[in-house]
Amino acid sequence: RRRELPVTRKSCRNLFRVDRLVLGQAQVLDRENDMSSPQSLEDEQGGGDPPGDLRSVLVTSVLNLEPLDEDLFRGRHYWVPTTQRLFGGQIVGQALVAAAKSVNEDVHVHSLHCYFVRAGDPKVPVLYQVERTRTGASFSVRSVKAVQHGKPIFICQASFQKVQPSPVQHQFSMPRVPFPEELLDHEALIEQYLSDPNLQEKYRVGLNRIAAQEVPIEIKLVNPPTVSQLQNMEPRQMFWVRARGYIGEGDIKMHCCVAAYMSDYAFLGTALLPHRWQHQVHFMVSLDHSMWFHTPFRADHWMLYECESPWAGEYGGEWDQGTDFGVAESLLSWEIRPSSPFSLYTGGSRGLVHGRLWRRDGVLAVS
């Protein structure tokens, strides 16, 4: 039975809150498309549910793929960055949704490795082709290819595992930071920056551009820099992040897909923090993206995202015998214009970013 439930709209800028919500349209995907675990996820990370009963737009729209055939799905776009290229997190999240639909309910993703091979076209949908590489008793591997205009734009390998106990356990300690309730949200922080009369025009333009974007996630920066610190920043940052709206406890696979979406937002910019004052970024793209999932979590509850960039430079020179082992690593490339208008155009720079997603109870959930 359908009935309508009023939902208060917080602001005219928030496209993810609507005036009326038809509950019959907001239910979880039907049994054929449901990716939830048969057991409800015990919520240990705290923080409570977001207010209201509005289903997260990440579940109802962004990550709700249309099945076309067995192991073939179509995804549409919800938010397109100002670069007019497809958001990398959307492609990763949708690809993981497609892969997760091809495995049993009792197995969950533990790692994925992705390559972005072409720029995505925001004017057309994306087709996701799943190959069942291996289905074993404990582990299953799926290959996903995202296609536009008959050519792959993205390839991904995802590994799934049955939940099994482990006698060996350890982890780093979560950084000691203020809780999200003590911090300004993204919108309030931007307004604070814009109210400073000493803010340089290039920062003002960039902040206004960010403020105009409508994204289905919420962010609160930890120790946000002052205006005077913007020109002298290290390549590391931390912020609390969660999906807008409600996802629920039991859908473990969907929480992983939402985390894959969120993992690419504000992540790559970590490598540029020490350089923005000196160079104008022409464009920046992901080259590859890897994730490891360690423990159940809720992506609609606040999680601490710890990001750092240990290296940026150019490709070349002799190969070093050392090996770089990274966590939550993403390799990116960008082209830059030096701040001087008389300098030559340069490009080909690359950077590496590591990240960790912590539950607020101190458990390392994703890296």
Model-derived regions: residue spans:
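Terminal targeting signals and extreme-terminal segments of soluble enzymes
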Residues: 16-326, 332-338, 342-367
